[in-house]
Swiss-Prot record:
Disordered, as annotated region: 133-247, 292-320
Protein name: WW domain binding protein 1-like
Protein species of origin: Homo sapiens (Human)
Pfam families: WBP-1
Composition-biased stretches (Low complexity): 158-173
Modification sites for Phosphoserine: S173
Gene that produces this protein: WBP1L
């Protein structure tokens, strides 16, 4: 074949073995004593093709890697563009989503910076008592005999006179300011003016005739407990006749104590509470037993201890004195043993 012939068609002198020369009429020198007429018979022919094939493979691999990298970048760019359009182009929403307002979910920064909402009240029973029962129980004015007027005014101030002005959504864990911060004469002047209106407004929802005498006894007993057992302005959180027990959901279940009362009075009070609150009233079974650190201090004293106290005759208590004040968790049991009745 003419295209496989050598480039040189003239005679060529070749050097063979032992420096012997020979002449090739056609083709070119090949080997020791041969004349080659085709290129595939040369050794460098295959070397050149091998190098060409290796370089071609390298170029193909590099091209494929570059192509894959470019496609990945293009896909990521398309994904980012789609996400950006979905987040900022509200017209691309489906038809049934276009009429929804944009303020259904607040921004993340607003949720993080907003203060936490207050927890719910301890129980629905306590919230209903704040709305239905009178804010305080007791006569319109005056204090029982044998009580210091200064302490009596502080006790009157410690009673929930400011409860009508409180918001119903205020969490019960927030304690009221200390009554020692306010002047004594101001509390003494405010007590006679505010007590009748609060008592009449609260008793108008239930039965005024049934609670009138019981409220007077409850108020008198409360002032005696404040002056004898507590003897300090911080005793506003002490409410006799109320026990607390922890329920497991970080709340305190408040129940009413039944101690030494007649059956007819208890039935009458229970009937009134059931009619007002549409549910049975939970009375404590452990009122006569005082577990350490689980009930308010000085609330469940035995009748013998109360009889031995000088100047404090035993008075029949109503079935319950429902003054819903916040429980002070920081009171220690040693604070009551150090105070003595005046």
């Amino acid at each position: 074949m003419p295209f496989l012939l050598g480039l040189r068609q003239d005679k060529e002198a070749c050097v063979g073995t032992n420096n012997q020369s020979y002449i090739c009429d056609t083709g070119h020198c090949c080997g020791q004593s041969q004349c080659c007429n085709y290129y595939y018979e040369l050794w460098w022919f295959w070397l050149v093709w091998t190098i060409i094939i290796i370089l071609s493979c390298c170029c193909v691999c590099h091209h494929r890697r570059a192509k894959h990298r470019l496609q990945a970048q293009q896909r990521q760019h398309e994904i980012n563009l789609i996400a950006y359009r979905e987040a900022h182009n509200y017209s691309a929403l489906p038809f049934y989503f276009r009429f929804l307002p944009n303020y259904l979910l607040p921004p993340y920064e607003e949720v993080v910076n907003r203060p936490p909402t207050p927890p719910p009240p301890y129980s629905a029973f306590q919230l209903q008592q704040q709305q239905l029962l009178p804010p305080q129980c007791g006569p319109a004015g005056g204090s029982p005999p044998g009580i210091d007027p200064t302490r009596g005014s502080q006790g009157a101030q410690s009673s929930p006179l400011s409860e009508p002005s409180r918001s119903s959504t205020r969490p019960p864990s927030i304690a009221d300011p200390d009554p020692s911060d306010l002047p004594v004469d101001r509390a003494a002047t405010k007590a006679p003016g505010m007590e009748p209106s609060g008592s009449v407004a609260g008793l108008g929802e239930l039965d005024p005739g049934a609670f009138l005498d019981k409220d007077a006894e409850c108020r008198e007993e409360l002032l005696k407990d404040d002056s004898s057992e507590h003897g300090a302005p911080d005793s506003k959180e002490k409410t006799p006749g109320r026990h607390r027990r922890f329920t497991g959901d970080s709340g305190i279940e408040v129940c009413v104590c039944n101690r030494g009362h007649h059956d007819d009075d208890l039935k009458e009070f229970n009937t009134l509470i059931d009619d007002a609150l549409d549910g049975p009233l939970d009375f404590c079974d452990s009122c006569h037993v005082r577990p350490p650190g689980d009930e308010e201090e000085g609330l469940c004293q035995s009748s013998e201890e109360q009889a031995r106290e000088p100047g404090h005759p035993h008075l029949p208590r109503p079935p319950a004195c429902l003054l819903l004040n916040t429980i002070n968790e920081q009171d220690s049991p040693n604070s009551q043993s150090s105070s003595s009745p005046s």
